[in-house]
């Protein structure tokens, strides 16, 4: 940092960071979460200390950290596996890229969602089922993952040499990196609450001298309204 003015690292998604930090502390992000608890404040302070000391940053107006990484103003960042294409584009062969699993036991799984709605006709439901069956075959999952950067949902695809040898930096480590995945509970208000956590953390980390306790108290009140 002192020699090259390069920030150590950061997280693309602050809500992902916050939720995953709490999960590894044994706390689930749901309606029972108390944002003013010691573990919640610890999660915020960990990132805030890094920002203050210059070894962490947030994406901010860059939206994603792949661009700063490509411009060599940040040494590493935690983001979606689907960002590999953007990272390669930003780096443009200027330096060697390396990848590694998330640095914690519990890892959040997020991605593209496909649903079959109850309001659909019988014919539409059958068509949706046939499409999902088609999309989730081993061969199609390899093609889909290669083209999108998302993780295959079928283990046979993940463990296949064909997938591992696609040229993706992530493909060879996916099997080990996805051993302990978790998702947020599917409850009413979850999406709004999750997005609000990103807004709150960004407001804290973007300020020079934030009142963390006050902002977390306000976050608690907002969550209570969301969960109602």
Q: Where are the regions that the model predicts?
A:
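Extracytoplasmic/periplasmic solute-binding protein
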Residues: 1-32
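Glycine-centered hinge/linker elements that transmit conformational signals in sensory
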Residues: 1, 31-59
């Amino acid at each position: 940092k002192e020699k090259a003015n390069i920030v150590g690292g950061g997280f693309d998604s602050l809500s992902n960071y916050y939720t995953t930090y709490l999960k590894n502390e044994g706390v689930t992000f749901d309606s029972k979460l108390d944002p003013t608890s010691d573990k919640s404040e610890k999660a915020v302070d960990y990132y805030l200390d890094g920002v203050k000391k210059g070894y962490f940053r947030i994406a901010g107006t860059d939206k994603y950290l792949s661009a700063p990484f490509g411009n060599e103003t940040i040494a590493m960042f935690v983001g979606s596996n689907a960002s590999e294409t953007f990272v390669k584009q930003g780096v443009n062969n200027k330096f060697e890229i390396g990848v590694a699993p998330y640095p914690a036991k519990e890892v959040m799984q997020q991605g593209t969602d496909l649903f079959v709605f109850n309001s659909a006709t019988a014919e539409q439901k059958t068509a949706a089922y046939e499409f999902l069956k088609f999309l989730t075959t081993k061969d199609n999952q390899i093609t889909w993952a290669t083209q999108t950067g998302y993780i295959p949902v079928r283990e046979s695809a993940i463990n296949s040499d064909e997938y591992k040898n696609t040229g993706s930096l992530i493909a060879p480590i996916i099997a080990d990196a996805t051993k302990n995945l978790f998702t947020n509970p599917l409850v009413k208000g979850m999406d709004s609450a999750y997005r609000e956590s990103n807004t709150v953390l960004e407001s804290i980390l973007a300020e020079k001298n934030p009142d963390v306790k006050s902002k977390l108290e306000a976050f608690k009140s907002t969550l209570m309204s969301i969960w109602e």
